[in-house]
């Protein structure tokens, strides 16, 4: 199951992935205010969930501005691609440029994920898939059993993420579309997908 909680002034989605076992993962915790933080905590507590992972699709401030809060609250590292750490270190500059609160990146412990690496919690298994182009270190999280992938800003409804920001690469975005997402059929814009082989 997936709960979508829109957050911050960019209206970015925080995702809570969970099942009947009560274990869950948070993806792109992007809360800016105590009220937004409370929305996440209220949902987790209402379902009596145990957070096992805090995942990041890519290290742009609008997707990671709540990471410090989440890592502290649940005593977990931030799981992300090692290739995105350099951009993560620019979070204070990004925050100032984009109107976000500053976060203390040094307080966040990183758990590096590799493309094709699988993580499991409860009865859910996710595969990290490379989503290069929009931002260095972009990962998608693919749930083959339920037929979706959370893509961050790599893919939108009839569009792709910007490539004019630091580290963006339009050619890489096209490679991601052709090589990675060609395996999937888009069925929802916010969490796109279903494996073509399952049709």
Stretches found by the model and what they are:
Residues 1-47, 140-152:
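Conserved beta-strand hairpin/beta-sheet module of binuclear metal-dependent hydrolase folds
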Residues 1-3, 122-125:
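Conserved N-terminal entry element of GNAT/NAT acetyltransferase domains
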Residues 32-37, 41-121:
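Active-site HxH/HxHxD metal-binding segment of metal-dependent hydrolases
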Residues 5-7, 108-111, 130-132:
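Short Gly/Pro-enriched turn/cap motifs at secondary-structure boundaries
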Residues 31-32, 94, 124-199:
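Metallo-beta-lactamase
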Residues 3, 13, 109, 115-117, ...:
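Residue-level marker for the onset of beta-strands and adjacent loop->beta junctions
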Residues 25-27, 55, 78, 150, ...:
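Residue-level marker for buried hydrophobic side chains located in beta-strands
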């Amino acid at each position: 199951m997936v709960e979508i909680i829109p957050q911050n002034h960019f209206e970015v989605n925080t995702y809570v992935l969970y099942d009947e076992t009560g274990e869950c993962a948070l993806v792109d915790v992007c809360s800016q205010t105590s009220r937004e933080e409370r929305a996440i905590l209220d949902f987790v507590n209402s379902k009596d969930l145990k957070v096992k992972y805090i995942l990041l699709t890519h290290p742009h401030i609008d997707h990671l501005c709540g990471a410090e809060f989440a890592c502290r609250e649940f005593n977990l590292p931030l799981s992300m691609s090692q290739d995105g750490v350099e951009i993560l270190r620019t979070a204070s500059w990004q925050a100032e440029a984009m109107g976000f609160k500053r976060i203390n990146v040094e307080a966040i412990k990183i758990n590096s994920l590799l493309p094709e690496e699988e993580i499991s919690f409860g009865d859910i298994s996710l595969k990290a898939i490379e989503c290069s182009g929009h931002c260095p270190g972009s990962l998608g999280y693919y749930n083959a059993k339920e037929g979706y992938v959370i893509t961050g800003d790599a893919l939108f409804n009839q569009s792709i993420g910007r490539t004019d920001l630091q580290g963006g690469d339009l050619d890489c975005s096209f490679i991601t579309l052709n090589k990675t997402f060609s395996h999937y059929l888009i069925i929802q814009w916010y969490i796109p997908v279903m494996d073509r082989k399952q049709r």
